[in-house]
Amino acid sequence: MALSGGMDSTSLLLRLLREGYSVTCVSYLYGQKHSIEIEKAMENVERLQSKEFIVNHKIIDLRSAMGSFHSALTDETFEVPEGHYEEVQMKQTVVPNRNAIFSSILYGMGLSISQKEDCNVTIALGVHSGDHAIYPDCRPEFYNALSTAFQIGNWNSEKISFELPYIEGN
């Protein structure tokens, strides 16, 4: 699962553990200004591990690839806007192709785990309907198309599925 350290992905992690999943979390450093979330992700995983939950955590550094993407979240030349989540100025926080990149990495990891361990793998993401207005890569049609592309482009895709429990609700 993708674990940003924010509220959505952290609640998803807790849900997956409650449902009995063996969880590997992946956090991404991509040049984001709000790296405090990565620190919170690490703290939360450490706390869960101290309570005997089996949670693995990997941090993948994509700063050299994504750090120059034009977005208020990554570009030092403009401020992160404040305001209501659905306001137009919040579109400045879109990082081009971010969820496709993250999902592609997770999918490759899932295929590798599936092949090594001869098992099915679920890729879980905390994207939710509240993100739809601002982030086009948080919409159901995006993930349907992405899943189709991954299935067409990879062998053994029948062993991989996406779990997007919040995509239709808040």
Predicted regions and their residues:
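ATP-dependent adenylation/nucleotidyltransferase module used to activate substrates
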Residues: 1-170
